[in-house]
Amino acid sequence: QENGFDNVENKIKLKVKNNNEDYEITKILADFYRIEKKYDLAIKIYSELIKENPNDLWYTYYLRGICYEQSDNWHMAELDFLQSLKIKRNSPNVLNYLAYGWIERDIRIDESFVMLTEAYEENPDSHYILDSLAWAYFKKKDYVKAAELMEEVIDMVPGEAVSLDHLGDIYFAMNRKREAVYFWRQAKDLAKPEDEISDKIQIKLKEYDAS
């Protein structure tokens, strides 16, 4: 697999070199690193693109922000998402990523709720945005609305471990503990071992003698 990565990397690098550092091809290299979770390499190239190219700046800030967030550097991610929104105020994906990050940290809940409502109006078909909006209702302790929306998410993407885990948390807050445990178990079965939520779900299952 590493050999396959090297082959693709070298091919894209050669194209970049042969095309005088062409913006679009260079961006493909950055995107390749991001998809392959080589976030430091992706950040370096996105930073060069931001410095040298005015094209699609809002989107490049957004992609670099994702890399920072995935590298557990929320401070830098937050700055990039905010910068992206300064350039393009109503991008639903950027609104969603930033607002969800705040909600997960229990900060700026009301502001995040407004942003997610706007994002959902812009893109009602995104299960990611609907999940975030449902989670915002949960954080505001409107458990009935949170459950209603998260159930919609599960209808859209039945195998999404994060959403199943969220629904379990919502049901638990509503004192529907048996259903909560059921969805936590489903989430645990579907989550990849390296996923952050796996350990968190295991702790919840152990705590309630349900594993």
Where are the language model's segments positioned?
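TPR alpha-solenoid repeat register
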Residues: I25, Y59-T60, V94, I129, ...
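Residue-level recognition of tetratricopeptide repeat
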Residues: D31, I66, Y100-G101, W135, ...
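Terminal, low-structured helical/coil segments at or just beyond the last alpha-helical repeat
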Residues: H166, A173, K177-S211
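Structural marker of alpha-solenoid helical repeat scaffolds
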Residues: N18-N19, E52-N53, I87, E122, ...
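Register position in tetratricopeptide repeats
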Residues: Q1-E2, I35-E36, Q70, E104-R105, ...
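Canonical tetratricopeptide repeat
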Residues: I28, Y62-L63, Y97-L98, S132, ...
